[in-house]
């Protein structure tokens, strides 16, 4: 998966995108004035585009290799300035609660209930539909969360 931003992103959106790409093991490119078509050619596969609202990252749109929308996630980010201490890329999720399977599929996460390190934890919340929290190499919260308001998965 290739991760990029919408055009003219804020520093906070660029920083979030770079950090998410490192955590997930995705390739990241600075979009600049590149068209979405050029991004798809560069990617040669699926693409995730981070968009912003009021200068903050707020949406990740997932595109297939032809540019068709696979789905999107609306979220509020929550991350500390320190980088998470991970031994490996976080491509596993310790649990995928009922109703969040599409979210796991969009992000390309493998469900492994035995993993508690370098993995995501997904849970429900009173204020948000879902909270995706990254667990570090020690199995403790790494200071990186996606507070998910909504997500949609295409057919």
Curated annotation (Swiss-Prot):
Coiled-coil positions: none
Keyword S-adenosyl-L-methionine: no
InterPro entries, A to Z: Brix (IPR007109), Brix_dom_Rbsml_bgen_prot (IPR023548)
GO BP, sorted A to Z: rRNA processing
Stretches assigned to the Brix domain: 1-155
GO molecular function: rRNA binding
Keyword DNA damage: no
Record keywords, A-Z: Ribosome biogenesis
Function, in words: Probably involved in the biogenesis of the ribosome.
UniProt-recorded name of the protein: Probable Brix domain-containing ribosomal biogenesis protein
């Amino acid at each position: 998966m290739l991760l990029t931003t919408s055009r003219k992103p804020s520093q906070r959106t660029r920083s979030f995108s770079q950090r998410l790409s490192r955590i997930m093991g995705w390739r990241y490119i600075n979009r600049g004035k590149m068209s979405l078509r050029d991004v798809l050619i560069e990617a040669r596969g699926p693409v995730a585009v981070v968009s912003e609202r009021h200068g903050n990252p707020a949406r990740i749109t997932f595109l297939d290799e032809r540019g068709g929308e696979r789905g999107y996630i609306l979220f509020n980010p929550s991350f500390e300035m320190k980088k998470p201490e991970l031994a490996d890329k976080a491509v596993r999720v310790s649990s995928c609660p009922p109703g969040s399977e599409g979210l796991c599929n969009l992000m390309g996460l493998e469900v492994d209930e035995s993993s508690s390190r370098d993995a995501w934890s997904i849970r429900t919340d009173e204020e948000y539909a879902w909270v995706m929290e990254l667990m570090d190499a020690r199995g403790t919260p790494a200071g990186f969360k996606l507070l998910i308001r909504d997500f949609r998965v295409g057919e």
